[in-house]
Design a protein with these regions (language model features):
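The feature marks short, hydrophobic/small-residue-biased sequence motifs that occur predominantly
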Residues: 5-48, 92, 116-119
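Short, solvent-exposed hinge/capping segments at secondary-structure junctions
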Residues: 34, 55-70
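A residue-level structural signature of the nucleotidyltransferase/glycosyltransferase Rossmann-like core
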Residues: 51-52, 114
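Basic-flanked hydrophobic alpha-helices used for secretion and membrane insertion
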Residues: 69-160
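Peri-transmembrane interface segments
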Residues: 142-193
Length: 193
């Protein structure tokens, strides 16, 4: 399993900005998800250096950010929790600076949505305690047992927790793959005719 934190954030690089999700992951993440294989430029997160992140190709394009640019850091902002009126906008946000060391490419939607970083970076940004997270991601060894594991977790955790499979989390991605497979099948069928 892997501990994760996901939160919408405001990203700023030089004079450009974008709203996306910061996803803080611990060092077990690659045992659950082989996202490092999608990194086409640079490297995956360096867990020894808290301030490193990996951005999607869509975010890289929007912000004009590359990997290993030591001259400029990626600034990440989230609103400070609280209630009521904000008297000074400069004090309304928590922020950290990060160094993009890799760029990944999966789907257009995911590439514009997620920035992956060290779990401790996300905890610092959100003022979370070291044991505070927003989710756990599991890898089930036998894919045929996924529904059973999901049912057991829902039963044991109760209604306060959301238990989703990878397909449910990334439904758009899996629908796109199915559409591509159908389109490929139809094209090959037409070629054979």
């Amino acid at each position: 399993y892997c501990k994760v934190i996901e939160e919408r954030a405001f990203f700023s690089y030089q004079d450009k900005s974008h709203i996306a999700v910061i996803k803080g992951v611990d060092s077990n993440y690659l045992a659950v998800s082989r996202l490092d294989t999608a990194v086409y430029f640079g490297d995956w997160i360096d867990y020894e250096v808290k301030q490193t992140v990996v951005v999607g190709s869509g975010i890289s394009s929007i912000l004009s950010v590359g990997a290993y640019d030591f001259m400029e850091s990626l600034k990440i902002f989230v609103p400070k929790p609280g209630e009521g009126y904000i008297s000074n906008p400069e004090n309304a946000f928590e922020s950290v600076q990060a160094l993009p060391i890799g760029i990944y490419k999966l789907t257009e939607e995911i590439d514009k949505k997620f920035v992956y970083g060290n779990l401790s970076l996300a905890q610092e940004l959100l003022n979370y305690k070291p044991d505070q997270i927003t989710g756990l991601e599991l890898k089930v060894r036998n894919p045929e047992e996924i529904k059973e594991v999901q049912r057991d977790l829902k039963e044991k955790l109760g209604q306060a927790f959301k238990v989703q499979t990878r397909e449910q989390l990334n439904s758009v991605f899996y629908k796109m793959l199915n559409t591509e497979n159908i389109a490929s099948y139809l094209v090959f069928t037409l070629v054979l005719i």
